[in-house]
From Swiss-Prot:
Residues 365-375, 387-400, 410-428, 487-497, 605-632, 649-666 have a biased composition (Polar residues). Residues 36-46, 563-574, 742-753, 803-818 have a biased composition (Low complexity). Ca(2+) 2 binds at D875, D936, D938, D943. Its cofactor is Ca(2+). Rab-3 effector. Residues 844-967, 984-1103 form the C2 domain. This is Rabphilin-1. The keyword Repeat applies. Ca(2+) 3 binds at D1015, D1021, D1075, D1077. Residues 1-56, 88-140, 365-710, 737-779, 796-818 are annotated as: Disordered. GO terms for cellular component: membrane; synapse; synaptic vesicle. PROSITE patterns: C2, RABBD, ZF_FYVE.
Amino acid sequence: MTKSTKLRHCKQKKKKPEKTPKGNPPILITEKSIEDAATTTSTTDALLGSPEGSRSKSRKLKLCCCTAQAATLSPLDPTSYGGIASTSAHNGMVGGLSRDSRAASRTSKRGSSKSLNRPQIDADEPSTSGTNPDRRPSTHFVLDLPVVSTRLRKLSEAFFNAQHGDKIDLMNDWEIGGTQNKWVCPSDRHLHLRAQLKSGWSVRTATARSPTNSKAQTGSITAAEQEHIQKVLAKAEESKSKEQQRIGKMVDRLEKMRRRATGNGVTHCLLCHTEFGLLASKSYAAMCVDCRKYVCQRNCGVETTDVNQTTGKVETVFLCKICSEAREVLWKKSGAWFYKEMPEFQRPDDRLPYYVPVTTNGTLPNASSAATPLSGTPGGAGPQPMTMPSTSSCQMTTPKWASPGVCNSPGLQMNGGPTSPLPNGTRRNTGHGGIEFPSSSRPSICSVLQAIEPLDRSKSPRPRIQPRWVNEKVMSSMSVDDEEKAASSSDGESFVQSGVPRRALNNKTPVGSTSATTSPAPPPTSTTPTSRREANMERFSRHTHAHANRLYSTDDDDDSSPESRPSTRSTSPRHSLATPSSYAHDTCHDTSLPDADTRSIDSGVVQSDHSNPQQSGLTCSSSSLTPLQQQASHDHHSGGGTPRRISNPDRTTSRVAQSASGTSLVTPPPPISSRTSPDNCNSSPLNVMEHKSSSASTASSGGNRRVGSAEPVLNNHHAMHNNQNHNDINKKLISQTSRAESPLAASSSFLSSPDDDTKQKNRRRDGVGRVNSLQLRTSLDDVAPPVAPISKMNGHIVSSEPTSSTTSNQNHTSVPIPTVPVVPEEEEEKAITASTESASEPGSLGSITLTLTYHSADKKLKMHLIRAKNLKAMDSNGFSDPYVKFHLLPGNTKATKLTSKTIEKTLNPEWNEEMSYYGITEDDKEKKILRVTVLDRDRIGSDFLGETRIALKKLNDNEMKKFNLYLESALPVPQQTKEEENEDRGKINVGLQYNIQQGSLFININRCVELVGMDSTGFSDPYCKVSLTPITSKAHRAKTSTKKRTLNPEWNEQLQFVVPFKDLPKKTLQIGVYDHDLGKHDDYIGGILLSTSAKDERGRQWIKCIENPGTLVEAWHRLELDS
């Protein structure tokens, strides 16, 4: 390589210093240059072709202030204010840069290597700590000329275009690198600048009234703007009308589905009318949780999920297709879930709307007013929206099946609750013309369906199935108006509860009646007591004859239509024991028993109205035709309640005459006597005995003849014969026959057993012999005329034989009194025995066998459930799936509930299962009763089979006792008051032991029983906190584990506290039971304090622990709220 080549390579390797191109020298901008550039703005505008040649003074000042503030406040970010810096630089370049700016540029060229792309602080400037602290150091920006020129040109064009069209809002900074959203609120410096210029908030508020433009006000809305507004309103009305029509079509489709439902929901499917027969499987029928009706499980219902309001958990529920569609239409698709009310809708047909406005005179509006177009609708065309107006302007049209007593209220009466179509009660005036739902939860679908019930439901082919107990009222105790209201309200309530409207009452002549027809009762002309009493007596006469004619044809007194009377026996999947049967010939029921709960014990399932087919073989007892003394006295002392229906006195007297003489003797029915004082409500046992003997003898001799239906009725007033001899007899019989003939003695008591049947029969036989001998002496030896059978009706003592005084005052002639021969003692004894046995039916519900043992040392009640026999068949396959529940009454039923296992498909289950109650003290043993309930487990809910009760005070300590008891109907359960709940917080079992070798106190937390449920589910998540006070160490505090969802937790945990033995008498052991909660403080259930100064068992246990170290001392303590 030559020397010249090497020299060339060396020159190439040497790094040449970078030089700034001469064509585009960098420009340094300082605060001084920016101030000088502001004076040359007019020159820049002229050179760039401004049409006006110069800008206004205000716009110059605005631009200069903005650029100066931008360069001063943010010197370290030249890119964000590039537009402002470029504008100032361009103005300086075109008009001639100032002397300071050129000098600064030369200074930057000579020696500064750090001036590129970075702000510089001039070294010639004095420090801020000098004589002038307010002066800030000079800041320089190095910008390229092409970038400055481009941004200047764009910004200048924007300013010039603003003179001809849309104005540009400089306060939004979108031209200078800010956001392009024109609705962004300006910053504080922009507002401050506009306040100085008095230009308003923004450019768009320039036309508003202000101190500077108060005279330049624009006019009103133009015609074009008004037309545009009207188009928008018309479009909104059109969309609203379409939405109303859409909801109306869905509601109409739902109503058509309800009309096509022809089944009764009990023995037949509600939708397809398929009968649930004995050959069909039980799974084919399922009950809807909303309407409580049975439908086919496969084709007529759907399973869906729902949130339980009490537990908050998602559960699987079964709905019929009607209720499922109602949920979709009335809650989801209609938008009611959002508005919390049912919106307005239009029906597609021309029928009357659901809610029709009522004028002041009570008539419907005429067709012209109903056809008035809606205001705001274009042209007024289209159907009227059928709104649901508020209660202030319109009255809700109630269905025909609603009772008259609730028709005046805005809502329907549901189950005796508040008058409202909503579940929680009141119907609020929403102002939107709709039904407002409660905001807390979704309303019941049945309540919404009833709230929008149409007017033509009487045409529905759905039959009416009404239980007999609905109309079991004493007819004579009501006036004309009260009876009609009560009857209609009872009929309406039974079907409001099920969500199915009932038909209008068909007052037709019964099919089985062959006697003379009754004429309609004339309406009362006045409201005086005399006229009301006369109308009452007339109607009662008609009612007694009609009821006597169809006694064995139907049990419904209001409706005898063929479609409401079942043609076959009930094969319902749910056969109710406690509910009286609605089968046509099943009228034999014991009314002497107390009123039983006719609904399910477990799940609140409404039982069916049909009883078991096995009950059809029972004979008709006379107790269903005879008033009972204790039932009436119970009604009298209770002061309220509707008494049960009793037999007619004319039929009873005629039966007495038939059974005695063997001939058909007709006695006139007594009229209704005037209402007497409550003192006349009691009758002697002789009257009850005479009625039982006479009616029972008639039943035993096969006398099914209908007496008093076709014979002429005599209108004679009867009075009770007051004879001293008979009063003496009554006083004697009260002490002799009250126990033998009382309804509770005749029926199975709660401590009766099948082994006691022989004793009861012997006792009844002895009572019958004494009564017959007394009756024989009375009828043959006494001088006074014989006493006729006395009937008691709603507290009125009515005799079937008139006295001579009343007869002479009315007819002035003596009426011949037929003599009644004495019934032989043997026949009467058999009749009364059969009557009492059929009335009480001691084995009709079966029996149960179990043993009980009370261990006094451990405070434990041990139960051994053995078996049950002859239970009722509640399933369609002829069997039941029985299980047993135990409760301790009175007390918290949920805390004391014990449940046995379920034996499937049997009527004679064998359990052989042992269960125990802990913490049963001597006080509990004397006060509490063990309730034993037998239930049939089903897919949804449970059916009641029977129950019995055992008093714990009958048990001996540490001795096993066997019970074989008859099952009875459901008895009322006493409810705890708030005071009792606060007192009874539960019990805890604690063991104490002091170990001298370790110097520690051991506390055993064994278990708690009968705790109070603190959560919304009725349960608690309990745990214990234990502390030894006064606290000298952190180790003297401890707590147990948490037991989830229980009221009887069992811990069996041991806690250890190190404490000297000599300090124990001064210490106090504090134990508290708490309910664990998430997200809030734990609830305090109760606690105890153990110390030497404590009372009762608490002090004794602590003293025993101190006196006997090394010995475990256990005791039960009752928790207190204020411990």
